[in-house]
Every structure is written in structure tokens, then in C-alpha cells.
Amino acid sequence: MTVRLTSLVKRHLGVDPEITGVTADSRKVKPGFLFAALPGSTVDGAAFAAKAVEAGAAAVIADLDLNLSVPTVVCRDPRRGYALAAANFWGRQPQTCVAVTGTNGKTSVANFCRQMFAGAGHASASMGTLGVTVSRPGEADLQVTPPGLTTPDAGDVAELLMHISRLGVTHFAMEASSHGIDQRRLDGVRLSAAGFLNLSQDHLDYHLTMDAYMKAKLRLFEQLMPRGATAVLNADNEAFPFFAAASVVSGQRVMSVGETGQALKLMERTLLPDGQRLKIRADGRMWDVRLPLAGAFQASNALVAAGLCRAAGLSFEDTFAGLERLNGAPGRLQRVGAGPRGGEAYVDYAHTPDGLETVLSALRPHVRGRLIVVFGAGGDRDKGKRPLMGEAAARLADVAIVTDDNPRSEVPAAIRADVLAGARGAKEIGDRREAIRAAAAMLEDGDILVVAGKGHEQGQIVAGVTHPFDDVEETAKALELVHG
């Protein structure tokens, strides 16, 4: 497969070599490739441009002329230039692409959309923290890539979109992380709709301020969505006015959802043993939806997913029928089992103050005894959220156990101390396996245990080494030990 350089960068150049591939990784360059020399926080891609040319690169994208023996395509924003060039190289994308952003809930919403698209008869796919999954009517789900980055590299995104298109996928939903948006990884995706869930403290190690964090997410609506596309916005979040204003100014149609929403208005929510019943006002009538998932946050996620499906062309009937058939995303309030004396154990991905508060608040109505939580905070990440997580756990759980959760290069005890500073009365058990076992041994009838932080992840990162560790597996083993 070859494409002329001018077709990729959409400008006239003195020369027009044939391009055989596009990458930002000099180690992957092959003869005929277009190499993107991207600026980075620690390493500048320009330092590897000469090496890329030696490996056969036919042209380079950079923010200044590098005086190489091959053409340099100078871009004021080389990351965006790379994303657009990759999209032009790989070409094909599903005809309907939607994205969702927010501090919490992106994985669930992307997965919900894929399930609902497939339920309506469309070959569909989702991309995000859980990898790329394809669902085709009448077939078992296909895992195209394993779990990894929430939003992959722009070149990988473009290639994956081409690949799933060849598999027949017509409807696609992806997570849009703040890192991914800021680093232009989604700039080549042709979006027809995007959703906003919520905004709370996270990733301040990268964005530094909440204002910068919000601006990164706003860019999805301000610059990545075309005029006339649909912005599906959670009206119940405090940041809603900012996202609504950005969407209106950008010429998008705003679809507000939630208790204070207009397009999909949640009128009533009733708890059920196996989920909840939602009364939703939409299209001038009331819809009674039995959602097989627990928690107010899942109702919110479901409404944003429903809005995205409506924006993608699904009927109200197919959309709400799809909500009633949903399966929760792995590691998202996932039930693991029960203790011998009763009590239920769950695993959840909650790793922010708001995420922890949301999960504990969702479980509280189902607790007849004690609510027990095992959690920690990650190393080399936003330190400001650690005491806030501790405060949320101590306030909302009856028993809080602080443990290790990917300490990375930091001293684990120091991270736990930061968390414990906000967690009055919490227990400290550094070894995560022992913490889970201690919590499982406490379970009595009416209790609920939630092991928070990792969700679907299957490793514990300590001093640069990833040790196998699966919260679901460890919680199940802990329950077995209690059973004897």
C-alpha cells in the first residue's frame, strides 16, 4: 500500500515521494515511511529524525525544518499533522464514530454503545482501556487488541479503524481521555457525536490545574467535532454549562441528558434487587426502562450511552431495549461472589476521589450491615488526590483498608501515609493480597466489600516491574479461603 505524500499532508511540496507507512516511533520506520518527529515532555522526536532517515524514511513531519536529505513537512502542530496524515494514509473508518470523555465512566459508556449498536443489528466496535472489541450480530465478540492505553497513538488509532472497517464494522465508540485529546490522538477520527460524563480531580500530574484538565476535554467539542454533529452532555454535572457553551459556539446540536436534562430526562429511579428501573421522558412520552446495573452513576452512564446511540441513528425503541440488555464492563462494579457467612464482594476500577465516592454511594443502599472498602493510590501520579480518596473512603465506608496500588517508583509506605492523612480511622495493610484477604474474612450477612482501584487490570507495578495481580482473581481466592 502506497500513498503520495501530498495526498497525506494536503499541501503542495517540491517533491512528492510515495509513502508506505506512517509512524512516530523511529524504531518502527521502514523504507518509504513518513516519520513524525513529535515534541515530548522528556524526549523530542526531532532527535531521532536522522536515525529515521537512515532507516529509510521518505519524509518527516516536524515543527521546524530539520535540514534532512528528505522532505520535511513543517507543521505548527506536528501532533495534529501526524494524526491527519495517518488517517489519510489508512483511509477507511466505520461510517458512524462516536467518542465519550469524562473523569469516570468512559469505559462503561463505550462498551454500552457497542452492545447497543450490536443489539440493533449493526456490526460494532469499542476502543479504550479494555482494548478493541468487535461485536457482530450472531457471532461471539472478537477481542482485536488487549487492554492497554485508554486512547492509543494516533497512527495506531487510524490503522485500527481501517482494520475493523475491513471486518465489517459500521458503528464505533471510543473513549476520549484528556491525555489522548491533548496529544491529538483523536484528531484523525471522523466523529458524528461525542459525549461528556463528568469532571472531577484526576491527572493533575499531567495537566497541573483543573482548568487545564477541563480545557483538554473541551477541545473534543471545540475542535474535533464538525459543525452539525451532536454533543451528548450530562446536564447533572457542574461542568455542564461549560461544555454546552463550547458545543453551541462550535455549531453542534446539544442533547442534554439526566435529571436536569431535556432530551433524555430521568424522571424517576427505583432500586431493584438486580438493578434499577428508570422512568425517562423523551420524544414527548415516558419510557419505562429496566436497567440491569446498580448505582446512580450507571444510570448516568446509561443515559449518555443512550444519547450517543440516538445521535448515531438508533430508534428510541432500539435504544431503550438495548439498555435493558446491557452487561457491565469488566472490573466496573463487578460482582465476584459471597462469603460463607453472607455478604457480597465486588471489584471496581474507581481510582479517583469522585470515582470512589460514586461507587461507595451506589452500594450503600444495598448494605444491611457494613460497607467495607480496600483501596490505594497510584505512585508517580496526582498526589493531591490521595488524601481526598482517603477522606471519601473514611466518610462513606464503615471499614476502610488502605493498601498499595501500583506504587511504581515511589516508596509504598509514603503513598499510604498520604492517603491515611485524609482517612481517619482507616486500617493500613500494605500488601494488597493480604488486605483483600483480611477484608474478605470480615464479611458477614448484609455486608458488602468493594476492592477498588484496579478493576480489569492484571498487574501491580512496583519499582518498574509489573507483577501479575488480578483483583477479581485475588478476591475470589480470598473468599475461597474464608469458605475453607
Residue positions per predicted region:
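N-terminal leader/targeting and accessory segments in enzymes
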Residues: M1-N88, T230, K265-L272, M286-D288, ...
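Acidic, Mg2+-coordinating active-site environments of NTP-dependent enzymes
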Residues: L5, A62-S69, L167, A173, ...
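Active-site beta-alpha connecting loops in nucleotide-dependent enzymes
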Residues: L38-V43, A329-G331, D354-R424, R432, ...
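Short glycine-rich anion-binding loops that position phosphate/pyrophosphate groups of nucleotides
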Residues: G40-S41, S178-H179, Q201-D202, N237-E238, ...
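Glycine/threonine-rich flexible loop motifs
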Residues: A46-A47, Q183-R184, D205-A212, D382-K385, ...
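Receiver (REC) domain switch/active-site residues of two-component response regulators
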Residues: A58, S192, D398
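Phosphate-binding loop of NTP-binding sites
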Residues: Y82-A235, P241-Q252, H366-V367, H483
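Glycine/aspartate-rich loop-and-adjacent alpha/beta segment that forms the canonical ThDP
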Residues: I448-L481
